[in-house]
């Protein structure tokens, strides 16, 4: 071998070794609601890859919603095409744990020093805990709130400094706004939102629950559920609410054609961007929460799915970065979700909330927060659809005047699909 040939061989080997030593670990990540989180994950990707240049993020096309996220994971677990990391609805972690798809984060948390000092408090960890182990770290948390078109509120003659505190007052204001013109609707209640979230909210607000403590019997058939479903029917009978899809209802508010919109805090930033200077928007509390009542925490958590040891190390770095004070602040500033991480609120967002009162509404509701309920067993998604379909029978007008009978049917149908 000539000296020149030897040099070429050494150079080639050096390049090969260098490439191997510094080959980036690729993490495949999938999250929901692309319209809401696109800017969020663009910022997180930039920050994370700058801090960890040896790890590259590959985002799959976003899930349509949390049900879609769970269904895809179930299928991909069979076909072995799971992403390394998935952002799952807070009420959808349970089925992934039950099927041994999600990876416990306990071994990773155990190795951390001063984890609590970084803002990871017990209540935050509890949200993603199942069978006494943490399987998901909350990434974005939301609560239901009211959005008001203050221009229409004033035109309707309502005291703008005393927005409705009860559903009776909401319906009264909706009637006044509805009377302003044929092209204006008083009220939009986004009941179709994922996971029956805005069905659970009014039931929980009265101290009710979805199932009995042993999870064997439907419990929303009592007074709390009766009140919640009849109030829902009143939105159509008295409040003039139309049978909008979620998208159409949202757009009617953004365009200035709806006076009140009930939805998640997650859309505050997007709403402000969409509305611009068309009208003044103000957020306010979810009405009629009685003493002892609660509201379900919406949002999502990061779940590790990869079983590869090397990828798990990289995945844990991404999970920590995204849920850290800095990562959580990005979420709050680019959406309307609240950061579950204490450090984000205490160090990064004090000035932000002072100048963004619409974002702060939900933060003031935090003492009311409870778990977003996940039905047990293999039929959880089926039960979600059953509840949706019964509510649709009221929204469509078919059974608008028989909320009691609809509730009885809903209870009976859900009971059939509970684990025996």
Which positions does each model-derived feature cover?
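Extracytoplasmic/periplasmic solute-binding protein
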Residues: 130-139, 144, 168-217, 224, ...
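Short, well-ordered beta-strand elements
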Residues: 24-35, 55-60, 85, 135, ...
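Extracytoplasmic/periplasmic substrate-recognition and gating elements
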Residues: 46, 50-51, 56, 156, ...
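Hinge/lid segment of periplasmic solute-binding proteins
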Residues: 90-145, 171, 198, 202, ...
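Glycine-centered hinge/linker elements that transmit conformational signals in sensory
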Residues: 171-178, 214-243, 286
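Extracytoplasmic "Venus flytrap"
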Residues: 26-43, 62-66, 142, 194, ...
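Extracytoplasmic "Venus flytrap"/periplasmic binding protein-like
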Residues: 47-120, 129, 155-157, 162, ...
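C-terminal capping/gating helix-and-loop segments adjacent to ligand/active sites or protein-protein/ligand interfaces
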Residues: 360-413
């Amino acid at each position: 071998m000539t000296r020149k040939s030897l040099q070429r061989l050494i150079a080639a080997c050096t390049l090969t070794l260098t490439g191997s030593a510094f080959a980036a670990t690729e993490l495949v990540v999938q999250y929901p609601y692309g319209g809401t989180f696109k800017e969020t994950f663009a910022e997180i990707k930039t920050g994370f890859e700058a801090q960890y240049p040896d790890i590259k993020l590959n985002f799959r096309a976003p899930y349509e919603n949390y049900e879609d996220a769970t269904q895809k994971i179930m299928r991909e677990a069979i076909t072995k095409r799971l992403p390394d990391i998935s952002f799952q609805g807070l009420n959808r972690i349970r089925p992934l744990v039950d099927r041994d798809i999600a990876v416990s984060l306990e071994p990773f948390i155990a190795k951390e020093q001063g984890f609590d000092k970084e803002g990871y408090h017990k209540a935050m960890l509890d949200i993603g805990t199942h069978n006494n182990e943490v399987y998901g770290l909350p990434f974005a948390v939301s609560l239901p709130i009211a959005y008001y078109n203050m221009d229409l509120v004033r035109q309707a003659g309502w005291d703008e400094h005393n927005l409705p505190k009860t559903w009776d007052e909401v319906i009264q204001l909706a009637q006044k706004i509805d009377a302003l013109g044929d092209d204006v609707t008083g009220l939009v209640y986004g009941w179709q939102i994922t996971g029956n979230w805005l069905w659970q909210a009014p039931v929980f607000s009265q101290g009710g629950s979805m199932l009995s403590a042993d999870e064997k019997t439907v419990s929303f058939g009592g007074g709390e559920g009766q009140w919640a479903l009849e109030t829902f029917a009143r939105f159509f009978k008295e409040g003039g609410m139309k049978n909008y899809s979620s998208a159409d209802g949202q757009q009617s508010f953004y365009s200035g054609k709806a006076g009140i919109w009930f939805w998640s805090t997650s859309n505050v930033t997007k709403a402000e961007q969409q509305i611009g200077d068309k009208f003044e928007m103000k957020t306010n509390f979810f009405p009629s929460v009685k003493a002892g009542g609660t509201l379900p925490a919406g949002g999502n958590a990061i779940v590790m799915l990869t079983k590869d040891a090397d990828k798990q190390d990289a995945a844990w770095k991404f999970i920590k970065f995204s849920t850290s004070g800095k990562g959580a602040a990005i979420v709050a500033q680019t959406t309307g979700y609240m950061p579950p991480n204490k450090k984000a609120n205490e160090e990064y967002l004090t000035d932000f909330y002072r100048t963004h009162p619409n974002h702060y509404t939900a933060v003031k509701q935090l003492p009311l927060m409870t778990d977003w309920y996940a039905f047990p067993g293999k039929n959880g998604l089926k039960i979600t659809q059953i509840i949706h379909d019964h509510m649709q029978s009221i929204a469509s007008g078919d059974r608008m005047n028989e909320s009691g009978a609809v509730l009885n049917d809903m209870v009976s149908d859900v009971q059939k699909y509970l684990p025996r």
